[in-house]
Amino acid sequence: MLVLLITALFIPVSTQAGTVLQNAASNNATESNIDRAVPALNETKLTLMPGKKYTLVLENADGCSVSWKSGNTDIVTVSKKGRITAVADGKTTVVATVTVPVTENKTKSYKLKCKVVVETVKEARIAAIGDLLFHDRVIASGKKSDGTYNYDAIFKGTADYFKTFDVMIANQETPFIDDPAKYKGYPSFGTPTALGDAMIKAGINVVTTATNHSWDQRTRGIEVTVDYWKSHKDEAIMLGMHKTENTFQTIHYKKVNGIRIAFINFTTFLNDSSGIQPYYVNILKSNTYNEYGGYYGSLTEEKLFEKIKKAKSKADFVIVLPHWGIEYTHTPTSAQKKLAQKMADAGADAIIGCHPHVVMPMKIIDASDGRRVPCYYSLGNFVSNMSQAARNLEGIAELTITKWNGETTIKNAEFTPIINHLSGSETSYCVYLLSDYTDEMAARHSSNYLYGKGTITVKGMLDLFNSIGNETWK
């Protein structure tokens, strides 16, 4: 009987402020002269940015006395009227002690709690550049008198700009090789590892290697490329190539300013796949997206989408980096568009493509879950020995993403034109922002100076860039 009596004295009441215990005797008309609802707070959980204010409202508290207290005034302060001011990142609880008159001579107190999280908006700036395509003359441009190689000059016009980004992605079009006798350009490229040194020095920290040239130097090219980037894993993440089967399904993540970003890179084809192990390169198996025919591929469409979904479940933001499309055309194929839509629907938050050696437009895709996904179909080259005007007009994909209160969104997506400057004699190469380029510099571009084409001017390049049909992020 004692247990039953104690249970009867307290009745749980659910309110917005949580469950409180109300004295059952207060409902007794012989004892209570005041019939009222239980006090409650309008909010029991809040997330605020530092500096923001919010006023908690007491409900059912007319005629009651109230005192307010913050559990940690270094995180939030609270005024006598329940006005919260967020001070600094952290978690604490604001308590309102409400004293309610029950009878003329009796009161009851309630402690109403609101959990408060103060969180600064996290932000990450991401950029990507196109193909580092090392033709014979590009290789030769870095050779020094002592036989070593240095390619810092290529990045002289962009390195400072690159370092303003938290994530800087580049497409290493051609595999590394460690035998100088095999340093070569088209058609079976072999590139000095000195390029990697220059990339790191320029601020590049994510490198894609799944391209149509990945198998140009066969197994040794795979080994040297993977080993080089593995030895620099604290400075850059390499995507796309694998020495062993157990890393083939690996998804790479990078945490930047509290935002976890996933990266997935693949190519739709190889120039030649004879003798390759199925796990060496991320190659999409489906010929639906392979405009060049039935080349070897081990990454099925279903596995690709599963990989994107898995990345989405573990990351705040997913970037997919396909090597796809038709060379030397500014227009995405229907196959690219279909694949882009499917990748967006699977969870890709941004799609950044390479391979065509010319820029294709940035378009905004509406994903099936309502997200808006920027798709840069092609960034064009970054450095090459192609003298044609369109192949020297290039782009930087630029994204600013933010995370707050568990939600990651794209604040801005831009496409910035750049230009590959080939010296008149084609002995040196440097890439510039088009906004930093002048017609005086253009006059010394090999396309104009050596070949007399006169096709590269600042206005001409800008007009071409604006003509490809880029959409604007709003």
Protein language model features and the residues they cover:
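Sec-dependent N-terminal signal peptides of Gram-positive bacterial secreted proteins and lipoproteins
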Residues: 1-17
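Extracytoplasmic soluble-region selector
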Residues: 4, 18-120
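Ser/Thr-centric signal marking residues that sit
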Residues: 7, 92, 225
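Sterically constrained small-residue positions within well-ordered secondary structures
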Residues: 8, 47-49, 59, 85, ...
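Acidic, metal/ion-coordinating pockets
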Residues: 95, 117-474
